[in-house]
Regions:
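C-terminal regulatory/interaction module of P-loop NTP-utilizing enzymes
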Residues: 1-82
Length: 82
């Protein structure tokens, strides 16, 4: 799905999500999907990752990916982002 459709999907699963968190997490999700990965993160992994971010009160910025293990499932992919 494109950015706007993904935003709508996330809002169904996380009604009332902080707008800044939503934008930053979607932007970072699509940046990660552009990388040369063995398994690009899917919609369900995005939903799971945002769930962790919300529950942990984590901040998202472009310099780090908190709880990246919730977003990427392949060990080689995780190593690429370290």
């Amino acid at each position: 799905p494109d950015w706007d459709m993904m935003k709508s999907i996330v809002e169904v699963h996380h009604p009332g999500i902080d707008r800044d968190l939503l934008k930053r997490s979607l932007d970072l999700f699509y940046q990660v999907r552009e990388l040369d990965l063995r398994k690009r993160p899917s919609t369900s992994e995005l939903i799971d990752w945002i769930n962790v971010l919300v529950h942990e009160g984590a901040m998202v910025d472009s310099s780090t990916i908190p709880f990246v293990g919730s977003l990427l499932k392949n060990e080689e992919d995780l190593e690429k982002l370290k």
